[in-house]
Amino acid sequence: MSMISSKDHKFIINYNAFEIFLTFIINIRLLGFVNNMVLKIKVGHTPDSDDAFMFYAIESGLISTGNFEIEHIVEDIENLNKKAIKHELEVTAISAHAYAYLSDYVILNSGGSFGINYGPIIISKKDSINNIQNAFIGIPGSMTSAYLLMSIALGKLHCKEMLFSDIPNAVLNDEIDYGLIIHESQITYSDLKLNKVFDLGHWWNKTTAGLPVPLGINVASSKLLNSDQIVEFDKILRESIRYNINHLEDAVDFSTKYGRNTSRNILTKFIQMYVNDYTVEMQSQGKKSISKLIEMAKSNNILKKDVEIKYSY
């Protein structure tokens, strides 16, 4: 029977220690390699001027995007809501309402669109919402926050889904009786001699004792990105928004390419309405407003299930 000498035993211990140390070094180097790899991601946002404004510094290469190589997917909000359900994009803008129908998503703290005592409105040739229950209303999508706000405020209505930009003219041409309008149309509807008959922003402000109106949010798929990557992208988006606010004229110029022939003055006004302090950082009030929206939808039997709301931090 062979015996291991104390010298051999010491060698085995030293060899094992060296092997552990070498494995540790390799893992550290591999981790560094992985962390330095370029990660290609698809990021969805709408063609609305406020969304374009937020992404100006990122899309123009004016700030570092870290290890992310970003492909911008620019589509209507309802299309982005539907893409989110299928996890087609790593990061995307969605309606706050749409979050209730998603799973495995985290809400970013930056990039949200919140109204401050203003928001979607209902327009018509009529002077009031009297008898609206028997009328047809054009809506920009059944998963939009505007539609959820209207449903909470006014109950179940006869609605027709339309491209949001077509709604004002549809009212003008008597294709629908009322129109639920979002985006720049909130400012330009009066050019068509149409009437504002219900202001959902004012209604929300009064109903919730002054919470901001939760409209659009940015989410990241936790199926496609890990928590560190989500936090990192959140920081990049926040840096972009801050840069753009500090370079307002240049960022507005960039936004005009998505402006749908809207004047620069209107675009600037709309951007300054919806790119605000809550866009840079959602803060506790922004989070409270999202929770309140979901809570009110449940109490009105619009949402049937509990919704777990997760934030990047």
Region locations from a protein language model:
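A structural signal for short loop-to-beta-strand junctions that line the ligand-binding cleft
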Residues: 41-42, 104-113, 136
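Pocket-lining segment of extracytoplasmic ligand-binding domains
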Residues: 165-256
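Hydrophobic/proline-rich hinge and linker segments of small-molecule sensing/allosteric domains
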Residues: 108-129, 206-223
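Bilobed "Venus flytrap"/periplasmic-binding protein-like clamshell domains
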Residues: 38-60, 120-177, 182-184, 288-292
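A local structural motif
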Residues: 63-73, 153-166, 303-309
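Beta->alpha turn/N-cap motifs
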Residues: 76-78, 87-100, 163-164, 181-187
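Secondary-structure end/capping motifs
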Residues: 226-296
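Extracytoplasmic small-molecule ligand-binding "clamshell" domains
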Residues: 50-54, 62-95
